[in-house]
């Protein structure tokens, strides 16, 4: 249709009842638009769009050693003497979710297992 003369174009438009030439440039409406909205990135080490160098957006650099939440041993504060052993004996033990498991024993009747 693009190579048809104006007379043929007018004849085609009149026969079809619509302007066929106006539709040529918009025949693919599912094509993405030229201006795209900025991306919506989740907040994280690389959530900034600019001024975001590779060394600062690398998540491995934000990893730190694990912090001790609870310890069964009491840590001594520097500059203070150790407290009495009676105080250490009354210290509470860590709470466990279940009683300790019994030690497994090997079967006596089948020594090959």
Swiss-Prot record:
What stretch or stretches form a coiled coil here? none
- Residues that the record marks as modified (Phosphothreonine) are 96
* Keyword Transmembrane found: no
| GO CC entries | mitochondrial inner membrane; mitochondrion; respiratory chain complex I
Region described as Disordered: 80-113
Which of UniProt's keywords are assigned here?
Acetylation, Electron transport, Membrane, Mitochondrion, Mitochondrion inner membrane, Phosphoprotein, Respiratory chain, Transport
Which residues are recorded with the post-translational modification N6-acetyllysine? 40
The biased composition feature labelled Basic and acidic residues covers: 102-113
Q: What Pfam families is this protein classified in?
A: CI-B14_5a
InterPro entries reported for this sequence: NDUA7 (IPR009947)
Any Gene Ontology biological process = ATP synthesis coupled electron transport
Q: Where does the UniProt annotation locate this protein?
A: Mitochondrion inner membrane
Q: Which residues carry this modification: N-acetylalanine?
A: 2
Q: How does it sit in the membrane?
A: Peripheral membrane protein
Which PANTHER family does this entry report, sorted A to Z? NADH DEHYDROGENASE [UBIQUINONE] 1 ALPHA SUBCOMPLEX SUBUNIT 7, NADH-UBIQUINONE OXIDOREDUCTASE SUBUNIT B
Q: How does it assemble?
A: Complex I is composed of 45 different subunits.
* Similarity remark: Belongs to the complex I NDUFA7 subunit family.
Q: Name it.
A: NADH dehydrogenase [ubiquinone] 1 alpha subcomplex subunit 7
């Amino acid at each position: 249709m693009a190579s048809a003369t104006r007379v043929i174009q007018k004849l085609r438009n009149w026969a079809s009842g619509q302007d066929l030439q106006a539709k040529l440039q918009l025949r693919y409406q599912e094509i993405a638009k030229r201006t795209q909205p900025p991306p919506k990135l989740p907040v994280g080490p690389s959530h900034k769009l600019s001024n975001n160098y590779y060394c600062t957006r690398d998540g491995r650099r934000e990893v730190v050693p694990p912090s001790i939440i609870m310890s069964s041993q009491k840590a001594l504060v520097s500059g203070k003497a150790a407290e009495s052993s009676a105080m250490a004996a009354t210290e509470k033990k860590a709470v466990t979710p279940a009683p300790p498991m019994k030690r497994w024993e090997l079967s006596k009747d089948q020594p090959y297992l």
